[in-house]
């Protein structure tokens, strides 16, 4: 399957020979000229048969051997041409540095070097190529020509990823189920977040589904904090914990030890409900998982961790409460997916019938794998001819057992240059996230972007190549900005297959023999010792790439000695890419100067103290990465000789100055930092010659500019390609003295005036500027492209620039203006009082740390100020007391802390100082998405109201009193929500500023309760809380002229009616009746519904007594029905629930008669998820047999419920129930005689059922049962005969006073039991565990509230070899001998055990290390 891109190689080499005058000049000698011609002839002769060789290599051994040989010869020929080009480049550098005499001497030396060094190599390569050319006829290769030009470039214009996000094919039920799991209120994991595992084979769509669910509006509203982390194969607790913390805080975390990180993360998440997704999780280490979970113990109940993984073992290790198994798609779903990506927006009915017939056969061949369907669709997209589809189908039929042939079809359709670029990506480890710049620089270094006769930048060519590969589904983009990407594992396998031996990725210390033909080598630092890895490749003499990757456990710098490096680099003179990043090297080896072909050198995060001058002889060098070299303070003086240098990264490196002559680096495209020296070094004028600079340029130490005229010489105004500019002064000493407007300050103003950039600039930042005012250009409307401005630490400024006239400005941050007192009209209009609309695009405005600011004067405008403002943040402005700005948009989120600002000057309404708990870190402010309020004590108070369990969609509102998302005023909340829990906040907030005609976003998750919205409109209101779409200009506030509803990505506005009649679909446009989701609140009549309705949510409709009569017949697509707090609703229409339902959720509907409405003759064959909570007061007997497909059943707080009924003769295969939960049912007495006929039941929870006397009979027969939780069932005394099911993995018995663990339970025989928790109710036990009680498999043991427990029985742990985690809680009489009673453990937690706490208080941390207990936690204090 390899070697599909050689024609690109040949074409490029022939073009180089034809077009490079320098090569011709170098090879003027008779022998070298002849060799160059022979090389060209061999390439031209071999090129036409390469495609034929590709096709036959997979089936004919001789052809495959020939192809491998000529590929190696081609690469050696590339090396020869590169050496010749390097010699020409060297001559050019010497010529520029010397005179005519030097030029003649240089020319003679160059020819001599060619004759002695290069010609012998050239002769060898030419003979090798000619040898392979002679065998073309022998093995029967022929010219290969396509009948037409492939249309891949045209197809790439309409990219699959451009389809509407969130639109699923064949996964609607999966999405609903997973959303319901996340919204459920699961109390199973006491003191820990619940874990949900999404399991499936590679390519089945785990990540895609989880990402869509992660962004679902209900999930976003439900969780206060959401985090997404790509875990990868080499899971590391420290790295992932750090990544989680950085994701939350949106700022760098410098802590370098795990316990401190965990404490910091625990504090950050304390009292918050969070959702964490660990994507592509591989780790099967129990100890790592236990250690990772430590930081989440203080989070709010209902927090969730979601794992996507391909291994069920991983789910067991993580103690997943719910394992969601991803299934393959049906053939119909595969066809829908293929047609969508192959035909774009064309409806299926419009597709050519012949194409459709062939396409459906192809869909069958995809075997239900979405990745395969999408990849093949990308290939078919460029082939509208049925003959092409038939050829694909015919070729496909023999590959039904493997995905790689499916993926290779797309690969075969790529042009040669893209094939070679894709193949190089096989050096990336699976799961490696790479950014656009990283990949393009690597392609450039291997010379894969060369286009003869093209004037385009190499970087632009590379970006196009990357975009085409993304469009063809070879890469998956991780963000909408197209900057981060990942390759699916199957695509990684494909890259490895097509690259063959020429790319080698080492992933462990079992070093195989690396083929001599290998050109590109990578390895994982965590799995491979560097010295071993480097020594293993010395025999690969033609190696071009050495690239180590930072897997999670390798973030700390590693040791690498010159003893290892020198022989390696001496042997590999053909290297183009070399990365030594993060290694603890202090000096570069001299052998580095022999790497004349090197184009990419990464020395970032090393400990080098200087960059030797010989580095400047590497004239091919294009990329030099020196970021975070903390000991490097200068660059070599001869750096100007690197005339091919295109990127110089100096971020985080403390350079004192730039060396003189840097202006000669005219190829430089990106320079991260230009440092101005105090007495020497390059001046600002040298920037003038660097006309191609792009990206963001930082100019540091501007206080060292001696004359303002130097700034003008920088020529920033003539740099149109710069996106961002940072101008930074450094303030020496204590800072400033108020009123000290001296000459220095004036000079700085003049310098800043001269540094006017090009109008195309997008982001601009000024730091520590000490001028008294800003130049006029800053704020000029001609800067139409600026979207972000940050002004920081401008201590002597007494006014702000007129940035209100920047038409595209979206983000403005003004920080630490220590003497500024007034923000006036000039801030909006400038000195000329321009009447252009100020701040017409501004979305975020932040003021921070301005101690003397006391007055804010805003203009009075007809349309209000800041028309697009989404967030206003004012922090640490203690003098600002006067009038709050009027006319803000109604949806603006306002954050105020450490500021006594009054809403109306002299009025009673004000924002009180109680809002000071808002995070004060400047870095964290822009990421805030809601207002956070705290109770007077600063501790959030959670509401104990009932919410959903796994498998059910919950009410959209959340009842955390300390958060709000609503567009209604507080006074408009329904009376039942204005409870004493909320009253405590009214005294703190007062009321909103009176000038807000429609109040800003403020409330605490009372979303959706807007009582003054016309009730007639309610049937067509939006998904919860009516949160405005930022892309839609329509208003959604009460009293406005339009309201919004969401139709799965389609936004529409509905006229606000004034009549009291219910609205019918006929009153609206056709597209509005296509609504799929509808939520209604606070209505008394619900008439007709949208015809295509799939989900109906009825909430808090006290006056609603009935549902639409035609609900059961007229809405065949209705799959989800949620009824919450409808206290007057008594029955379903037609005497039974709709039979089309898959999810039915009923809560707080006491009068609803559920059982009487069920018809014994009717099977509710579609219902899969059923939740009944605090409802149906007449529910006594639940007819389980009427629900054959029910997968999840939860009955909560149903006082009358007593038992289940099973229809006589029901077969064991009839009921599909997988999850059963019964809580707070005080009259539940028994289960059906003979037990539960639920062979698929995997999870069962019984909680607070005071009269329940026994578990189901034949419990042992429930062989699918994996987890069993028995909580607060005081009358259960024994376990049914036969004991527990054999496959049980998790057993929790809590507060069941009469259930005492005994050998008779047969726990010892449970070979799969991993997690055992016994909590309370064991008054007679003084020693635990009894010998022979515990199974060998138990991994985690928790014992709690054993009131009389005095000792641990060492013999009871004798056979428990797997146990790693033990938790002991609430055992006040327990005493143990640390070194004798405890089994070998990885994790030990002790809490509320007074005697044990005293014992361990005397033990040093080192003692635990001696005992081999890596993690010990005692009453929250960590010892490790």
UniProtKB/Swiss-Prot annotation:
Keyword Repeat in record: yes
Composition bias, Polar residues: 912-927, 934-972
SUPFAM superfamilies recorded: L domain-like, P-loop containing nucleoside triphosphate hydrolases
Location of the NB-ARC domain: 152-454
Keyword field contains Transport: no
Residues that hold ATP according to the record: 200-207
InterPro entries: Apaf_helical, Leu-rich_rpt_typical-subtyp, LRR_dom_sf, LRR_R13L1-DRL21, NB-ARC, P-loop_NTPase, Rx_N, WH-like_DNA-bd_sf
Keywords, comma-separated and alphabetical: ATP-binding, Leucine-rich repeat, Nucleotide-binding, Plant defense, Repeat
Pfam families on file: LRR_R13L1-DRL21, NB-ARC, Rx_N, WH_DRP
Segments annotated as LRR repeats: 498-523, 552-571, 572-595, 597-618, 620-641, 642-665, 806-830, 1090-1114, 1118-1139, 1238-1262, 1264-1286, 1310-1336
Alphabetical GO biological process terms: defense response to bacterium; defense response to fungus
GO molecular function annotations of the record: adenylate cyclase activity; ADP binding; ATP binding
Location of region: Disordered: 911-977, 1050-1070
Protein family according to the UniProt entry: Belongs to the disease resistance NB-LRR family.
PANTHER family, per the entry: DISEASE RESISTANCE PROTEIN RGA4, PLANT BROAD-SPECTRUM MILDEW RESISTANCE PROTEIN RPW8
Role played: Potential disease resistance protein.
Domain notes: The LRR repeats probably act as specificity determinant of pathogen recognition.
Protein name: Putative disease resistance protein At3g14460
């Amino acid at each position: 399957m390899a070697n599909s891109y050689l024609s690109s190689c040949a074409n490029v080499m022939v073009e180089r020979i034809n077009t490079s005058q320098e090569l011709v000049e170098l090879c003027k000698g008779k022998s070298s000229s002849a060799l160059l011609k022979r090389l060209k002839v061999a390439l031209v002769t071999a090129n036409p048969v390469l495609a034929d060789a590709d096709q036959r290599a997979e089936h004919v051994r001789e052809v495959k051997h020939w192809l491998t040989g000529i590929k190696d010869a081609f690469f050696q020929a590339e090396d020869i041409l590169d050496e010749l080009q390097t010699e020409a480049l060297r001559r050019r550098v010497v010529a520029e540095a010397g005179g005519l005499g030097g030029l003649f001497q240089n020319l003679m030396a160059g020819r001599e070097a060619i004759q002695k060094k290069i010609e012998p190599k050239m002769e060898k390569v030419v003979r090798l190529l000619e040898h392979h050319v002679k065998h073309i006829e022998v093995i029967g290769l022929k010219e290969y020509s396509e009948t037409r030009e492939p249309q891949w470039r045209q197809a790439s214009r309409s990219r699959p990823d451009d389809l509407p996000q969130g639109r699923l094919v064949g996964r609607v039920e999966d999405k609903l189920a997973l959303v319901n799991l996340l919204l459920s209120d699961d109390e199973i994991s006491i003191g820990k977040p619940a874990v949900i595992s999404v399991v499936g084979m590679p390519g089945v769509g785990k990540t895609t589904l989880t990402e869509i669910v992660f962004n679902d509006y209900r999930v976003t509203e439900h969780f206060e904090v959401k985090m997404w982390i790509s875990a990868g194969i080499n899971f590391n607790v420290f790295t992932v914990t750090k990544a989680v913390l950085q994701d939350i805080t949106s700022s760098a975390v410098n802590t370098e030890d795990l316990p401190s990180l965990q404490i910091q993360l625990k504090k950050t998440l304390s009292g918050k409900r969070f959702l964490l997704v660990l994507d592509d999780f591989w780790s099967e280490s129990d100890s790592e998982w236990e250690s990772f979970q430590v930081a989440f113990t203080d989070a709010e109940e209902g927090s969730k961790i979601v794992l996507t993984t391909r291994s069920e073992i991983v789910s067991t290790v993580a103690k997943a409460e719910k394992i969601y198994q991803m299934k393959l798609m049906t053939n119909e779903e595969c066809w829908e997916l293929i047609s969508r990506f192959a035909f774009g927006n064309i409806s299926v009915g419009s597709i050519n019938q012949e194409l459709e017939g062939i396409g459906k056969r192809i869909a069958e061949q995809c075997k239900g794998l979405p990745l395969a369907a999408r990849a093949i669709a990308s290939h078919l997209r460029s082939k509208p001819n049925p003959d092409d589809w038939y050829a694909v189908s015919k070729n496909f039929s023999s590959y039904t057992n493997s995905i790689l042939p499916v993926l290779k079809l797309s690969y075969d359709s790529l042009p040669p240059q893209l094939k070679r670029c894709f193949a190089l990506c096989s050096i990336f480890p699976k799961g490696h996230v790479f950014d656009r710049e990283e990949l393009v620089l690597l392609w450039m270094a291997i010379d894969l972007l060369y286009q003869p006769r093209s004037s385009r930048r190499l970087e632009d060519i590379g970006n196009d190549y990357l975009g085409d590969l993304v469009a063809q589904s070879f890469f998956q983009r991780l963000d909408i900005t197209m900057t981060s990407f990942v390759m699916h594992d199957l695509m990684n396998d494909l890259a490895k297959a097509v690259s063959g031996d020429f790319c080698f990725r080492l992933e462990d210390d079992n070093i195989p023999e690396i083929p001599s033909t290998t050109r590109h080598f990578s390895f994982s630092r965590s799995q491979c010792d560097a010295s071993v890895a480097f020594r293993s490749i010395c025999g690969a003499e033609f190696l071009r790439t050495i690239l180590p990757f930072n897997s999670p456990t390798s973030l700390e710098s590693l040791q690498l000695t010159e003893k290892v490096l020198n022989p390696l680099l001496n042997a590999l003179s053909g290297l183009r890419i070399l990365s030594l990043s993060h290694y603890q090297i202090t000096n570069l080896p001299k052998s580095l100067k022999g790497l004349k072909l090197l184009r990419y050198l990464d020395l970032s995060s090393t400990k080098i103290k200087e960059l030797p001058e010989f580095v400047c002889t590497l004239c091919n060098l294009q990329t030099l990465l020196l970021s975070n070299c903390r000991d490097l303070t200068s660059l070599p003086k001869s750096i100007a000789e690197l005339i091919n240098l295109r990127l110089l990264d100096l971020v985080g490196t403390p350079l004192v100055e730039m060396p003189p002559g840097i202006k000669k680096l005219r190829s430089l495209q990106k320079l991260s930092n230009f440092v101005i020296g105090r007495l020497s070094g390059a001046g600002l004028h040298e920037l003038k010659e660097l006309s191609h600079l792009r990206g963001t340029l930082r100019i540091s130490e501007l206080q060292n500019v001696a004359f303002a005229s130097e700034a003008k010489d920088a020529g920033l105004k003539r740099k149109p390609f710069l996106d961002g500019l940072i101008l930074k002064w450094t303030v020496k000493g204590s800072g400033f003295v108020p009123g000290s407007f001296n000459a220095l300050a004036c000079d700085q103003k003049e310098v800043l005036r001269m540094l006017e950039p090009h109008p195309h600039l997008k982001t601009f930042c000024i730091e520590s500027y000490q001028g008294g005012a800003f130049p006029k250009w800053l704020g000029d409307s001609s800067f139409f492209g600026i979207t972000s401005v940050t002004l920081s630490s401008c201590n002597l400024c007494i006014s702000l620039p007129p940035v209100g006239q920047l038409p595209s400005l979206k983000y403005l941050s003004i920080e630490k203006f220590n003497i500024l007192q007034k923000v006036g009209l000039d801030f909006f209009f400038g000195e000329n009082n321009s009447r252009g609309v100020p701040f017409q695009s501004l979305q975020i405005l932040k003021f921070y740390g301005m101690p003397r600011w006391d007055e804010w004067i805003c203009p009075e405008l007809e349309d209000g100020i800041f028309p697009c403002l989404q967030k206003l943040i004012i922090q640490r402005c203690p003098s600002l007391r006067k009038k709050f700005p009027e006319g803000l948009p109604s949806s603006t989120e306002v954050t105020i802390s450490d500021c006594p600002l009054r809403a109306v000057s002299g009025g009673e309404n004000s924002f009180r100082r109680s809002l000071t708990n808002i995070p004060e870190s400047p870095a964290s402010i822009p990421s805030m998405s809601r207002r956070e309020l705290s109770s007077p004590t600063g501790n959030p108070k959670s509401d104990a109201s009932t919410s959903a369990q796994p498998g059910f969609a919950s009410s959209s509102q959340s009842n955390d009193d300390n958060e709000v998302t609503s567009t209604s005023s507080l006074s408009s909340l329904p009376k039942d929500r204005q409870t004493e829990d909320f009253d405590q906040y009214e005294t703190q907030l007062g009321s909103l500023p009176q000038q807000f005609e429609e109040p800003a976003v403020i409330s605490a998750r009372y979303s959706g309760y807007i009582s003054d919205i016309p009730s007639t409109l309610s049937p067509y209101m939006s998904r919860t809380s009516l949160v405005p779409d930022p892309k839609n200009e329509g208003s959604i506030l009460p009293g406005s002229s339009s309201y919004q509803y969401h139709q799965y990505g389609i936004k529409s506005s509905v006229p606000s009616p004034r009549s009291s009649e219910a609205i019918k679909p006929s009153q609206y446009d056709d597209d509005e009746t296509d609504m799929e989701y509808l939520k209604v609140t606070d209505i008394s009549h619900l008439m007709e519904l949208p015809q295509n309705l799939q989900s109906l949510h009825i909430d808090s409709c006290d006056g609603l007594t009935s549902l639409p009569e035609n609900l059961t017949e007229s809405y065949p697509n209705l799959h989800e029905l949620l009824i919450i707090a409808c206290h007057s609703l008594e029955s379903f229409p037609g005497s039974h629930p709709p039979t089309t339902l898959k999810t039915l959720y009923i809560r707080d509907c006491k009068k609803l008669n559920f059982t009487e409405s069920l018809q014994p003759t009717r099977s509710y064959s579609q219902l899969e998820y059923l939740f009944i909570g605090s409802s149906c007061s007449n529910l006594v007997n639940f007819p389980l047999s009427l629900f054959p497909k029910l997968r999840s059943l939860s009955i909560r707080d149903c006082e009358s419920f007593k038992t289940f009924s099973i229809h006589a003769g029901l077969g064991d295969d009839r009921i599909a129930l997988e999850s059963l939960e019964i809580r707070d049912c005080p009259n539940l007495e028994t289960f059906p005689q003979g037990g539960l006929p639920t062979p698929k039941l995997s999870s069962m929870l019984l909680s607070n059922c005071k009269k329940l006397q026994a578990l189901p009979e034949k419990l042992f027969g429930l062989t699918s049962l994996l987890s069993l939780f028995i909580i607060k069932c005081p009358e259960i005394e024994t376990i049914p005969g036969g004991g527990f099911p054999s496959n049980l993995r998790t057993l929790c018995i809590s507060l069941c006073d009469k259930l005492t663990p005994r050998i008779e339970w047969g726990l010892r025989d449970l070979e799969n039991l991993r997690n055992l928790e016994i909590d309370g109710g064991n008054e007679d036990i003084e020693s635990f565990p009894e010998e022979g009680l515990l199974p060998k498999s138990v991994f985690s043991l928790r014992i709690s509230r054993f009131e009389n427990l005095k000792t641990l029985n060492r013999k009871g742990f004798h056979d428990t070899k797997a146990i790693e985690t033990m938790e002991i809680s609430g055992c006040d009489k327990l005493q143990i001998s640390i070194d004798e009673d405890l089994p070998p453990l990885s994790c030990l937690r002790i809490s509320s055990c007074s005697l044990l706490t005293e014992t361990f208080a005397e033990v040093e941390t080192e003692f635990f290390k001696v005992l081999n207990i890596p993690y010990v936690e005692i009453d929250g204090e960590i010892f490790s």
